[in-house]
Every structure is written in C-alpha cells, then in structure tokens.
C-alpha cells in the first residue's frame, strides 16, 4: 500500500471542542499506531481533505512521523476552494499551518463551494486515488465519514481495495492502556 486516504469524525461529532481535549491524544495515538504498521507495508502518502477533526489530527501525526520517516508525505485535496472561510479564526490558523507543511495541496473541484455534489466528488476522488481507506469511524455512530466509507465498500466489492477502521473500542483500549501505565 502506497497511498492511504484518511478520514473520520469532525470534532463536534465526538464532543470535542478544543484541540487540547484528552480525546485528541488518544485518537492521535491510534492513528500513529496504524500509520506505523502501514509504513512497514510501504506507505508513502497520506491523503486528507483538510476537514477539521480526525483529518487535521492525522496531518499532525504525519508531521511527527516525518522526523523518523522522511519519505512519508502528506497530500491535502480539498473538496473546493476556501473551505475554511467560515471557520473560527483559530481553526483557520491551524488549517493554514497544516497546508503550509503539507507536501502537496490542491482542490478537487477548483472552485468555491456550490453544492453537496462537491463532497460526493471528493469522496470518489479519494477512493479512486488511494490504495486503502483508514477511518476513525464506528458504524454504531454514523456521522460525516459514513459517505466515504460507503464509496470504499463499493470499491472493495469489485477491486482489491481495503478499508481499515479505528473504532470507539480501539480508543477505549488505548485509554485503558494509558491509565494502566500511569498507575504503575
């Protein structure tokens, strides 16, 4: 696997409203573990669309890993131009920081937001251009990742494509490990 599309919940879907929320640490640890395993399998590129939450946290994990794995690259393909224009200032700054550090940045539709169709096009693009999908997603709590997961499942039925998930139970395991380690 050379190209991994990464997505997941937006912060509000997880009840997270600040980047220093403890849940962010556990999500980033889970992403880090998955990325390490995929690096052993030849991972070269991580693709995100730049949405707030899991995708930008994944970008931060990639940047951390690049210190040890300099060949690992981050691509940000936004669904449309200026997706951040209605975000809070601190989120805009965080997003701009990610874009500045990314190895490749482009917009899929190359125009400003016009319709939800641009999100459908983004989902299709991500699945078409990647070898696998990693989603922080649990089918018991559908949310914004549901649509790209459905596209990935359709591709899995006809091609050699794989979807990997970080479930809430995986995050709970990490929390318990951390608590166990802190108790020792």
Swiss-Prot record:
The record's listing under InterPro entries reads: YspA
Output the Pfam families linked to this UniProt entry.
Answer: YpsA
Q: What family is this?
A: Belongs to the UPF0398 family.
Name used for this protein in its record: UPF0398 protein Bcer98_1280
Q: What is the lineage of its organism?
A: Bacteria, Bacillati, Bacillota, Bacilli, Bacillales
């Amino acid at each position: 696997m050379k190209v991994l599309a990464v997505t997941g919940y937006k912060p509000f879907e997880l009840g997270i409203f600040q980047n220093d929320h403890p849940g962010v640490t556990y999500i980033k640890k889970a992403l880090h573990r998955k990325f390490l395993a995929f690096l052993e399998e030849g991972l070269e590129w991580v693709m995100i669309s730049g949405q707030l939450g899991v995708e930008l946290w994944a970008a931060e994990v990639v940047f951390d890993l690049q210190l040890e794995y300099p060949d690992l690259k981050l691509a940000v393909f936004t669904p449309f131009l200026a997706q951040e224009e209605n975000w809070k200032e601190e989120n805009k700054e965080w997003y701009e920081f990610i874009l500045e550090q990314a190895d490749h940045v482009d917009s899929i539709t190359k125009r400003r937001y016009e319709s939800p169709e641009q999100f459908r096009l983004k989902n299709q693009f991500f699945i078409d251009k990647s070898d696998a999908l990693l989603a922080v997603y649990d089918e018991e709590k559908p949310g914004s990742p549901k649509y790209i997961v459905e596209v990935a499942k359709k591709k899995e039925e006809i091609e050699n494509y794989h979807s990997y998930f970080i479930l809430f139970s995986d995050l709970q395991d990490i929390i318990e490990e951390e608590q166990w380690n802190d108790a020792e």
